[in-house]
Amino acid sequence: MRGNGALLLDVPNRGRPISQSLFNSPRNVLVPLGSFDQGTGFLQDAGYTVAAVSWELGHGVELPTFKDAEGTTRYIEGTAFAIIRDVADFLSSASTDTVGTRNPLAGAISRTVALGYSQTGRFLKSFLVRGYNSVEGRRLFSGVHILGAASGHINLRSIPGPESGAGTIPTFDNPEVRGVNEEPLAISDVLEQVNSLGQIAPRMIFVNTTTDYFSLRASLGRTGGSGSEDKPLPPNVRMYDIAGASHVLLPGMVPGTGQCKLPYAILDWHPIMRSTLIALDRWLSTNISPPPNELMPLWEAAADAMALRAPNYLPKAIIQIPIRDQDGNANGGVRLPDMVAPLGTHGGQNPPLSFTCSLGSSYSAFAKTKEEREAANDSRLSLMERYKDRSDYVNRIRTAARDLEQRGFLLTEDVAIISHAAAEVTTLK
């Protein structure tokens, strides 16, 4: 397979490359973060060139330090911004480096896309607002694809020193952590700051999950740190909310005693990652616009909503969460077929809202019959009340999948996979 001219620069999350997991994971068989297992082979079959930047193992770490005015030893922070910039610039445009090492991709790259997930999505926004996406007046990344990082930046404030590369985030146990949810928060304000530097902002796609709104304050990426009205997204940005999706998928893992109360989320959101990457690349290479923004409607989180509250240092911030239907499923957004014809409630919060539970969210299956749900005091309609039989269910899944394909949110191969999975459901006859 010849390369398609696109370089995907994978910014690893806490040392773990993300690209194979996000884009090559088969349905219900997650390629782990950090793995170079090709999984479905989607990226390779499409001709993408993937480069991940990470530490070379076995050499130890000698971190540069300096002494501040008070004589305290401080660590030099933010060096990864320059590293990512220089590696991407070398691979995308240089013939050799400064000591004559040949660029293996010389002449093969026409566009460069940065990939970020959660922490490294926040890293990429910080990368942009600090002006690193320009080299000698040239724009470096023409595209940026970010999952799960609508609000906030990389944390270089709360933990100075060796551990800041991993960094902490605000949690339900520690909501006042500084350095992450800092202005500019709204995506429009992030891009405005890039423009103020005299730089041309890249074309960007942001993908959010339901969990991001409950556990990571994603609504601030739409409103900023004040008020509840969405700020208009710039024309070079698309934002897609995946209804019912969790921030992380933990297939095969069962919450243990004293851990999460509910089973982990199971909604497979990888098909949306694949389709939106194709849409972004098409936008860059042919100027064909991606599908319009698809956002979930929000309302202010009540005190008992199991949502991460606004920090005290943002007194005007209003945390908003997706509006749910009578089944507990989020309304609006990009609705995968498993949300259009659900077998349960996807993306619910998962007590006790520890780090893993709050990001893995939950799945709660519907009862099979009316008698079973009434015995369990479950107000949600049972499967037998929702669907005539398995054929009815499968037809609804297929119709929803074809609709998403027509709108640009599913690839043809994923339509077939989703439809086949529906036909194998055993809880309906």
Describe each PLM feature range.
Residues 1-429:
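C-terminal His-loop and adjacent cap/lid subdomain of alpha/beta-hydrolase
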